[in-house]
Structure formats: C-alpha cells, structure tokens
Design a protein with these regions (language model features):
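Alpha-helical transmembrane segments
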Residues: 29-40
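Membrane-proximal extracellular/periplasmic loop immediately following the first transmembrane helix
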Residues: 41-108
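The feature marks short, hydrophobic/small-residue-biased sequence motifs that occur predominantly
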Residues: 79-86, 91, 99-150, 198-208
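Generic recognition of well-ordered alpha-helical segments
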Residues: 7, 45, 83-88, 237-240, ...
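Small-residue-enriched segments and motifs
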Residues: 95, 121, 185-189
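N-terminal Sec/SRP start-transfer signal
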Residues: 1-31
C-alpha cells in the first residue's frame, strides 16, 4: 500500500499540469452534480406547490382560438368567454359544476396609499367563491362577498406583499382607503402570498371591475368546482360536451 502511494505521488509530481486538470475536472463534475440535484429538487417542489395551490376538483376555462375553419370562417379566430357562458355552466351543467364564477383582469394599475405606491399591478375581478378554488388564505379582514357583488362596491383585497409596500404596519390597512386608477377603494382584506414570487394580484368584485372598466359581457376566464364525475370516461365526456357548448 505504501509503495502504491509513493508511486502515485511520484507520478503526480512529474505530471503537475495533468494532475491539476484532473483535479479540476473532478471538482467541476462534483459541483455540477450537486447543482443539478438541487435544481431538480427545486423544480419538483415548485411543481408540487403549484399543483396543491388549486382545489383538486376545480377547473379553470380560458379563451383561446379556433382550430378549424367553419362555414367560410378561417381557423385561428379568437374565442372569448362571456356572461352567457356562466349561465350555461350553471343551468346546463348544474349537476356537474358548483361555484361558477368569472375572472376578469385589468393590468398595469397603480395602487397608492399616501406617499407609498406599488406599480404595474393586476386588478382581478372574481366571485366570492374564488378563495375556495384558489385556496386563498386570508391573514387579515375578509374576502369579497355577495354584498360586494350585488352593490358593485369598491372594496379590495390586497396581497401581503402589496400591503407591506404600502404600509409598515400592513395589517392596519384593513378599513383604510387606497387609490387604484385614481379611484378610492376600501381595503377589506389581506391575503397570504408566496413572497418568493412576483405577486401582483389585488382582488375586487367581479361586478365592480365590469362596471368600472366597461368590460361589457366579457367574462375573461371561468373557474368552478366539479362534482359527480367519478371515472375517467365521465370526465372526458364532460370536457368534450362542455367545450362544444361554449
């Protein structure tokens, strides 16, 4: 064993450059292995976190484009969702869906409180059922409710990140007024967000955003929970019929 060590040491002294390069290659390989393992675990954790964010039996429907030509109309036409689609979801598919609501967004709005502000935020109009679907956790105040919807109240629910930018004592913002697009909104709640991400969503009533920003019958996207679909075949049939009806 001693002779082997002497031989290795002697060879290393005679070939210093090759020894150095070999050592560097081994060290670099170990570093890359650790880095890739860490990145892989990070991606897995991010995917798990994203998949658990939404209720398991929830569904979100987005507008898109047509994939086929129809009666002289070309493919690639824009598909928009409107209030009629909310009614169809409730009436035609009532035995399969619950908590149907629209989700409308107004981008690049500023939120001001005194001399403090947060820029380029997204104002999102949702139904009171949204926290159930999106698993929104409130840390102060309340979420949008049915009275806000019915009376089109200018009430807003801020993220914790937004509230912290506006006030050091961010919980004290509940009950205070902030300005959004030069309109006064009362803060009724603050929700917990993932501060490692860029959280820019502030929630108001779906009916309010439609009125203030003249959205007409545009529904943006739809979100709802699903029930009474027990097999894969049931789910595939529902998806096919639902897509065809809207």
């Amino acid at each position: 064993m001693r002779e082997l060590i002497k031989e290795i040491w002697s060879t290393s002294k005679r070939n210093k450059l090759r020894t150095s390069l070999t050592g560097f290659a081994v060290a670099w390989g170990i570093f890359m292995l650790i880095f890739l393992l860490g990145a892989g675990n990070g991606l897995i954790n991010a995917q798990l976190q994203q998949s658990t964010r939404f209720l398991a039996n929830s569904m979100r429907v987005f507008p898109g484009e047509t994939s086929k030509a129809y009666k002289g109309l070309k493919e690639g036409r824009s598909i928009t969702l409107n209030d009629k689609d909310i009614l169809i979801s409730n009436k035609t598919y009532g035995q399969y869906v619950d908590d149907v609501g629209g989700r409308l967004e107004q981008y690049n709005v500023n939120i001001n409180y005194g001399d403090n502000y947060v820029a380029s935020q997204s104002l999102v109009g949702v139904a009171p059922t949204h926290p159930k679907i999106d698993k929104t956790e409130l840390i102060a105040g309340r979420f949008i409710n049915e009275i806000d919807m019915k009376e089109q109240r200018k009430n807003v629910v801020l993220s914790r990140s937004q509230a912290k930018e506006l006030s050091k004592d961010y919980r004290s913002l509940v009950g205070k007024n902030v300005k959004i697009s030069n309109l006064n909104f009362q803060v009724v709640g603050i929700y917990k967000d993932d501060e490692s991400r860029n959280n820019t969503e502030a929630f108001i009533a779906y009916s309010t955003i439609k009125t203030i920003y003249a959205k007409g019958d545009d529904a943006g996207s739809l979100e709802f929970t699903i029930k009474n679909l027990k097999t894969k075949e049931d789910n595939e049939k529902f998806e096919k019929n639902y897509r065809a009806s809207i």
